[in-house]
Amino acid sequence: MIQGTLYIVSAPSGAGKSSLIQALLKTQPLYDTQVSVSHTTRAMRPGENQGEHYFFITEEAFRQMIDNNEFLEHARVFDNYYGTSRKVIEETLASGVDVFLDIDWQGAQQIRKKMPSARSIFILPPSKEELCRRLRGRGQDSEDIIEKRMDQAVAEMVHYNEYDYLIVNDDFNTALADLHTIIRSERLHRERQAQRHDALISKLLAD
């Protein structure tokens, strides 16, 4: 079985990473690509569903999972905890499915230490002004929260140079095409292709 690839995707809030990942998944078979569903202690937003967008749990339950070493990574962001189940990720990758992790730079650093083979992608907005406009356009946060998110955005973007790939989400379709290109190139990597075409290569090299 060909091991799936773990993709780390990070961006400041409002840069469009979640929309890009969801658009990508609509074009990929479920047996090829899945998105990781994280655990979080933050409140559920309108339109979100338990187990689909996040596993919403109490802070007490989250801390218990930390004590049990059940997370591949976890971090505290905007006064809430977020974490990724180690077991789910490892089992999914072992089945040959690529997994996307929508996490911040703190989680990305933890993942890279534990899974050096993971590929990382950072998504930038075209400008601070556009980022602020997008945050206001969501209609989910107060001005105080938006201001806090803008401050956090700068702190997040400082870490762009820790990632393998960089995408600027100015035009959505162009950014999506860039994301497709990254996935396609990784699937054409020699190691994965050699596993996929092992029988063919053996025949070609046979005396």
From Swiss-Prot:
CDD domains: GMPK. Its EC number is 2.7.4.8. Residues 4-184 form the Guanylate kinase-like domain. GO terms for cellular component: cytosol. Pfam families: Guanylate_kin (PF00625). The keyword ATP-binding applies. It comes from the Bacteria. ATP binds at A11, P12, S13, G14, A15, G16, K17, S18. It catalyses: GMP + ATP = GDP + ADP. Signal peptide: none annotated. It is found in: Cytoplasm. SUPFAM superfamilies: P-loop containing nucleoside triphosphate hydrolases (SSF52540). One of its GO terms (molecular function) is guanylate kinase activity. Transmembrane segments: none annotated. InterPro entries: GK/Ca_channel_bsu, Guanylate_kin-like_dom, Guanylate_kinase, Guanylate_kinase_CS, P-loop_NTPase. Keywords: ATP-binding, Cytoplasm, Kinase, Nucleotide-binding, Transferase. NCBIfam families: guanyl_kin. Essential for recycling GMP and indirectly, cGMP. Belongs to the guanylate kinase family. This is Guanylate kinase. It comes from Photorhabdus laumondii subsp. laumondii (strain DSM 15139 / CIP 105565 / TT01).
